[in-house]
Amino acid sequence: MPISSSFSIRRNAKLWQISTASLTFTVFGRFPELGRVYASATGEHKVAVVDMETFKTIAKTGPVKYPDGIAYAPGAKRVFVSDEHGNADAVIDTTTNSLVATIPLDGGAGNTVYDPGSGHIFVAVHEKNELVTIDPSTAKIVGHYPIPGIESPHGMAFDVSARLAFVAGEENNKLAVVDLANMKVLATYPVGKDPDVLAFDTGLEQLCVSAESRNVTVFRENGKTLVTVGSFSIPHAHTVSVDSDTHLVYFPLQNIEGHPLLRIMEPSRMK
């Protein structure tokens, strides 16, 4: 999905525009502590680094066969990038913006997420139906955890305070709740076909699961289980982001009547 603009979540105002004539950005990782955005430039098989003040591309690093999920480990000062088609996770040193390691996963890399509770990077591995944990400082795999009931895990979100992970399976359209204390699956729930991106509102304890099939399923956390709030359909709504302060939910839509659109919704309307 070509991205041409960004928005201030606080003011819902258009702030800047980046020409993407030669780049297609599919995933952004925005890290204010670095003053940079790391974006997957899939057409070039690289990760682009954009300065948040000047909005200029200051570096490109790779090769990464198909860069997808992006996460930042602050202690190690490293960015980890899912290489979905390369069956690996790529590691970028943010002090030099250079590729310093490639971690083989023996399967397609789904989402990559940093867990501040454990200090580890989590990667969903498609063909292995498991979560892999990585020590950011050594860039070594430190754990393999099967996710029974989930086929081809891809999207992930965490409730860090409750020590829960939510993992969606692309092949069987299920969502798992995983207890991070023991890495056991507590329950699974049906979601829309081809689930992609997950977003968790820490204030409302509410989870959105967006799917390639246009379906969005909304859950409310209830202890260590989930209660379905509702579901609805939005064209191209396979990407979602939430602001836990305002509770607004953002859906960047690729093509609505011939042009990209950012749809912003209040949680009370997502039923």
Which residues does each predicted region cover?
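Predominantly soluble domains enriched in secretory-pathway, periplasmic, or organellar proteins
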Residues: M1-K271
